[in-house]
Amino acid sequence: MSDFDEFERQLNENKQERDKENRHRKRSHSRSRSRDRKRRSRSRDRRNRDQRSASRDRRRRSKPLTRGAKEEHGGLIRSPRHEKKKKVRKYWDVPPPGFEHITPMQYKAMQAAGQIPATALLPTMTPDGLAVTPTPVPVVGSQMTRQARRLYVGNIPFGITEEAMMDFFNAQMRLGGLTQAPGNPVLAVQINQDKNFAFLEFRSVDETTQAMAFDGIIFQGQSLKIRRPHDYQPLPGMSENPSVYVPGVVSTVVPDSAHKLFIGGLPNYLNDDQVKELLTSFGPLKAFNLVKDSATGLSKGYAFCEYVDINVTDQAIAGLNGMQLGDKKLLVQRASVGAKNATLVSLPSTINQTPVTLQVPGLMSSQVQMGGHPTEVLCLMNMVLPEELLDDEEYEEIVEDVRDECSKYGLVKSIEIPRPVDGVEVPGCGKIFVEFTSVFDCQKAMQGLTGRKFANRVVVTKYCDPDSYHRRDFW
């Protein structure tokens, strides 16, 4: 055998040997993988048995399943409690924290009107994948509702402090049962002493609205005027008027209704108290407003009112309409459109036959006595300003003009016009006092001078006590 044949035989043997080893390794690896699969299968079987056993133990220990259970892997398991919390609606049908006094529909209406940013309360995702809803701005200090939580208060007592004003309104709110939560409803007070008004800020919109019922309340002798601020914008779905009536408080705003009365033909020199005394002879008033000139502050000769007892409305119309006051005749009727045509058939016929005897200061007619008890001293008001009395020459001219005019009605005995003094509060400064020799002459002067104009100002008159006049007690 040649060397080449020997070499080729050797190669074939080596190849056969390698093929045998490869087949052996494949069979061994296949058996190993099969054993591994069997071991893993047995392990899974054991785990499944353990899980099923543990699940059965948990079901035996747990309470009976309620609604909310679900089927999984052929068995029943309880829904985790934290999943139930995720289902609670917080911001769509329930008012968020800070908006407890607003119904869900009102809250949605405010969102639609742009008064609450719709995106401000949208859930955001944390890096862990959890949904977190931002906390909404609470009502207290919220700029969203600040306009609706403020009230203008006019005609405040001179020199009143912010603390006293806050204490007064907080006390009145509690006494009237108008607070909605413990604590003080008034958060802040701002007073403008120069212009004699203040602004109140409340903690909630509803308490602000209810505080409107105190319009006309007396505070330290002053009838407060309560209004909404000029920048007030009504909130959607919320009432603008209070739902309560505070006994004894006569509001200065008379809302439109079938019971609102118009009183025309009033003498211009009558003030609020005089007209109210005329009207309250039929019953207590719920609201009253004497319309005045914004420039002079004097009456325009007509007013509006509403009675607490609506049943006396027609009686007041029957008793006051056509009444003669001085040189004027009253026109009293319902202010609402169409309501003034309401018939009075159901009223007793004796109403029109009964004269109304009233005691109204400043009036004089067959039914109304003027100025209380007449005296020989007449007080003239709204004629001069204190600064107009500083100049001696101008002062003497005023005295002379008053004397000349009053002498037309009778013999003038004396005239007193208190003048201002620097650093001293002078009693009666700005008023003019005229003493006649008889009460009769003084009455004639009052009739002739009341309602006249002096320096383009309407003259207002009243009687003065002679003893006080002689003591120079001009308060």
From Swiss-Prot:
Entry-linked Pfam families: RRM_1
Residues joined by cross-link Glycyl lysine isopeptide (Lys-Gly) (interchain with G-Cter in SUMO2): K15, K70
InterPro entries referenced in this protein's UniProt entry, alphabetically: Nucleotide-bd_a/b_plait_sf, RBD_domain_sf, RRM_dom, U2AF_lg
UniProt region (Disordered), positions on chain: 1-90
Gene3D superfamilies: 3.30.70.330
UniProt region (Required for interaction with PRPF19), positions on chain: 2-93
A GO BP annotation: negative regulation of protein ubiquitination
Residues found modified as 5-hydroxylysine: K15, K276
Post-translational modification: Lysyl-hydroxylation at Lys-15 and Lys-276 affects the mRNA splicing activity of the protein, leading to regulate some, but not all, alternative splicing events.
Compositionally biased spans, kind Basic and acidic residues: 7-22, 47-56
Keyword ATP-binding in record: no
Signal sequence region: none
Post-translational modification Phosphoserine, affected residues: S2, S79, S294
Regions of compositional bias (Basic residues) in chain numbering: 23-46, 79-89
Modified residues (N-acetylserine): S2
Disulfide cross-links: none
Single GO MF descriptor: C2H2 zinc finger domain binding
Gene Ontology CC annotations of this record: nuclear speck; nucleus; Prp19 complex; spliceosomal complex; U2-type prespliceosome; U2AF complex
Family: Belongs to the splicing factor SR family.
Protein function: Plays a role in pre-mRNA splicing and 3'-end processing. By recruiting PRPF19 and the PRP19C/Prp19 complex/NTC/Nineteen complex to the RNA polymerase II C-terminal domain (CTD), and thereby pre-mRNA, may couple transcription to splicing. Required for the export of mRNA out of the nucleus, even if the mRNA is encoded by an intron-less gene. Positively regulates pre-mRNA 3'-end processing by recruiting the CFIm complex to cleavage and polyadenylation signals.
Subunit structure as annotated in this protein's UniProt entry: Interacts with U2AF1L4. Heterodimer with U2AF1. Binds unphosphorylated SF1. Interacts with SCAF11 and SNW1. Interacts with ZRSR2/U2AF1-RS2. Interacts with RBM17. Interacts with PRPF19; the interaction is direct. Interacts with POLR2A (via the C-terminal domain); Interacts with PRPF19; the interaction is direct. Interacts with POLR2A (via the C-terminal domain); recruits PRPF19 and the Prp19 complex to the pre-mRNA. Interacts with KHDC4 (Isoform 2). Interacts with ZRSR2. Interacts with the SF3B complex composed of SF3B1, SF3B2, SF3B3, SF3B4, SF3B5, SF3B6 and PHF5A.
Record-given protein name: Splicing factor U2AF 65 kDa subunit
